[in-house]
């Protein structure tokens, strides 16, 4: 496991888990506000810190059958990497297990995995060539972290398909899934959320510009900038989620219950 999923004492793990539950619940509520979820069909997960070094790895995820706006910190379930619910009430959706558990297992840096169907990224996924153009300044940093899954039309009903998705993701953070949606990963909840938010905004600009029928202005390839610095050091990502949590604290305080 990466350093961020470190072993904690039982007391520390309990406090840390609640903090992470609140962050995850906030992301579900924010996603609902933006219409990123496909009714009850989407899922977000998070690997949890281990209370002791020999503890089996577990992850947090939304239970099957709930819309994102219904979810609260306490309603999220805890599962092991074999798909068993070990804490909480509810069922783990099989497709969620086959995608999320395999990404977590095969890519330890993917501590948080968000799988949603936001309007603009999903629209781009439906194009013959689903790609983010090098047309907006956001693309200068985003595009090197994007991979396209052009062969994901088969149902995700086993670990083999989950492994294919995980291996294709590799060290990228954004997967545009052709004719489907998007999966975004990160080392923390706030990093994955911020990455998803920026990618969807960038897709919105692209789709809006393309709707004019005019040719997109292409930025020089020499300006492409890879993300510098270790994951977890993107302070603005934490501030971004905190800002949204302040709004939720006022308008939807039950998310943190």
Each predicted region: which residue ranges?
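Glycine-rich flexible loops
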Residues: 1-257
